[in-house]
Amino acid sequence: GRVLDLDNEWLIITDRKGVAKVNKQTLKEEKYYLQPGMSIVGAITISSQKQVWTANARHHATDIYILDRDLNLLRTLNGSKDTYIESIVEDASHHMWVTTSKGLLCYDAKTWEELLLPTDFMEATQNKKIHFVLPYWQNFLLIGISGEGMYRYDVARRVLTRFHVQQQLKGDRYVCFIDTNNGIWLSDQENDFHYYPEKAAFNNLSSIFERLEDPFVKNLLFDYEGYLWMRSSH
């Protein structure tokens, strides 16, 4: 499941029952939100408005539930029945980006209205497998498109450009994380691991796994002290 930080007192956790609000001190569940088919949803985030945006199902999710901080349903955003939701993130301009099986959708985090995207952006991302969408330096997004590579999208200017062109993302799946120095940590979850600093061209940190028999990276996380935590297959 997922663990999200709501505020100083509360966590939002997904488990087999649905979405739970949990007290950090007592670890007691104050409230659940559950709809048929939800289970352990993967596409979920907490917006800048302290609202929970979550997919309506674990598999083949088509709709988004917007919940308040007490997990009361505020609104349902209905999607197409043949378009499946994969992830939800918010950028610095308070736009919610929804990755789907057929491309990207964008919503206003405050009004919940869908926003129109530039034609060239839609052509570049529509009907393609998108590995990740992450808030990046200042008001940018980092977008990873399968078989093509990484793109940087200027949200204010609405301009999409290729980024680190050596990387074409030809693998089946990727783990990507952006640190506080705007460095990009990228793994294909098999045997390759790359670090892209903000200003340098390219570095390969695969040697970090020399002591591991099977360097299968599942997750990357930087904690508040700046340490990198990796969850591997061992």
In which residue ranges do the predicted regions lie?
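Carboxylate-rich, polar loop motifs that coordinate divalent cations or form catalytic acidic clusters
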Residues: 1-234
